[in-house]
Amino acid sequence: MSRNLYYTGPPKFIIKGIMNSTALPQEIQNLTRARFADWLNAHNIAPYRADQVFKWLFVHRAESFDQMTNISKPVRTLLAESFIIGRLKIARTQQSADGTRKYLFELSDGEHIESVLIPEEDHFTLCVSTQVGCAQGCAFCMTAKKGFVRNLTPAEITGQVLGALKTLAPEERLTNIVLMGMGEPLANYDNVITSLDTICDGDCGLQFSTRRVTLSTSGLVPRMAPLGLATTVNLAVSLNATDNKTRDMLMPINKTYPIEVLLEACRTYPLSNRRKITFEYILMAGVNDSEKDALRLVKLLRSIKAKVNLIPFNEHEGAAFKRPDDAAIERFKQILHDRQYTVMTRQSKGADISAACGQLAADIKKYGQNK
C-alpha cells in the first residue's frame, strides 16, 4: 500500500528533503519500512537492509545505530548522519490501586501527553494518544479542556508503545493497543496510518496483530472509509447519544456529521470477515441512560454489524455529568442484550489517578513528586 513519505506534524517537524542525506537528521521512526527501503535504494544501499534496521529499532529496541552489528560501519555512519533514533521521555508515572499505570510523556518541544497501561487477567492493554490536546470539544472529556495544540508524529505515537514496553517486567505481556487516548486519531490521519503500519508490522515492526489494535473515532466521517481500506485494525465509534439534539450537546462534531450520516458511514465501512464495529456509549445519568434511549439505540444499529461497549461516566472534579446508578446501567444493558446485541460494560480502571475514559489531560501538577 502506498504511503506518503511526508507526515503532517507541526512546522518544526516537517521533513524536508529526506531523500537527500545532507538534510538535518530526522527521526527514523517517522518512516514506514517501505519508505525507508526507498531511501536506502536512493542511496545505493540494498533495500533489504530496511528489514534489518527496523528489526533493530522495534524488535530489539536499539537506541543507537552502533548497536546494529549486522549493518556495515559505512551504512551505520550514513544512517547516523541522516537520522536520529527518537525516544520519548517518561516524565512521570502513576500507579492506581487496581494496577493501572499512567505515563506522562514529555515531547521534544516540551509538550506533554499521557498513555495508560491497563491490566487485564493475563495481559496488558495500552491506551495511546494521537494528538497533544484535542479539537473535538466533547463535553464529557477532560482532554477537550486543553484544546488542540498539535498532531503527534508517527515516532511519537509508536514511541508511547516502546516506552511502555520498556517498563514491563519479564513476565508481563502487552498484547493490545487502543488508540483512545488524547486526541481524535482520524484528525491526524496520515501520521496515525504510518504508525499503524509499524505497530502492525508482524515481521520487523512492533508485531501487534490488527485484531488486537482498535482505533476509536468521534465520527470524522470522511476519513472512515479510507481507514477501512488502509488497515484492518478494529474500529470503535464514540456514539454516546441516540438523537441529534443530545449528541449535538455532547459532541460538537455531530453538527457537521449527524447521527444518520455517521451510521450510514458505518453501514458501508469495509469490515473484514467476522469483524464488528464497536459502538462506545458513555452512560450519563438523566442524559442518555433511559429505556427509550436503549430502544432507540437498538433501532439505530439495525443492519450494522455492531457490538456495544457501555461506559458508565467517570466522574471528576468540575464534571457536568453524573454516573447512572447500577440499576439504570443494568437495565440499559439488558434491553440491548435481549435484542441479541453483544454488550460489554467497561469496568473503569485507574479512576483514582485520573486515568479512566475521558480523564486524560496531561496535567503535570497532578503527578506531584511521583516519578
Swiss-Prot record:
UniProt-listed Pfam families: Radical_SAM, RlmN_N
Any single GO molecular-function term of the entry would be: 4 iron, 4 sulfur cluster binding
Give the matching InterPro entries: Aldolase_TIM, Elp3/MiaA/NifB-like_rSAM, Methyltransferase_A, RlmN_N, RNA_MTrfase_RlmN, rRNA_lsu_MTrfase_RlmN/Cfr, rSAM
- Matches recorded under PROSITE patterns: RADICAL_SAM
Keywords attached to this entry: 4Fe-4S, Cytoplasm, Disulfide bond, Iron, Iron-sulfur, Metal-binding, Methyltransferase, rRNA processing, S-adenosyl-L-methionine, Transferase, tRNA processing
Judging by the UniProt lineage, the source's domain of life is Bacteria
Which pairs are disulfide-linked?
A: 127-357
Q: What does the record give as the active site?
A: 114, 357
Listed GO biological process terms: rRNA base methylation; tRNA methylation
Q: Where are the transmembrane segments?
A: none
Q: Tell me the residue numbers annotated for binding S-adenosyl-L-methionine.
A: 183-184, 216, 238-240, 314
Radical SAM core domain residues: 120-352
**Record-level GO cellular component terms:** cytoplasm
Where found, per UniProt? Cytoplasm
Cofactor binding remark = Binds 1 [4Fe-4S] cluster. The cluster is coordinated with 3 cysteines and an exchangeable S-adenosyl-L-methionine.
- What Gene3D superfamilies does the record tag this protein with? 1.10.150.530, Aldolase class I
EC number(s) stated in the UniProt entry for this protein: 2.1.1.192
Q: Which family does it belong to?
A: Belongs to the radical SAM superfamily. RlmN family.
Q: What else is known?
A: Reaction proceeds by a ping-pong mechanism involving intermediate methylation of a conserved cysteine residue.
Q: Protein name, please?
A: Dual-specificity RNA methyltransferase RlmN
Tell me which species this is from.
Answer: Desulfosudis oleivorans (strain DSM 6200 / JCM 39069 / Hxd3) (Desulfococcus oleovorans)
State the encoding gene: rlmN
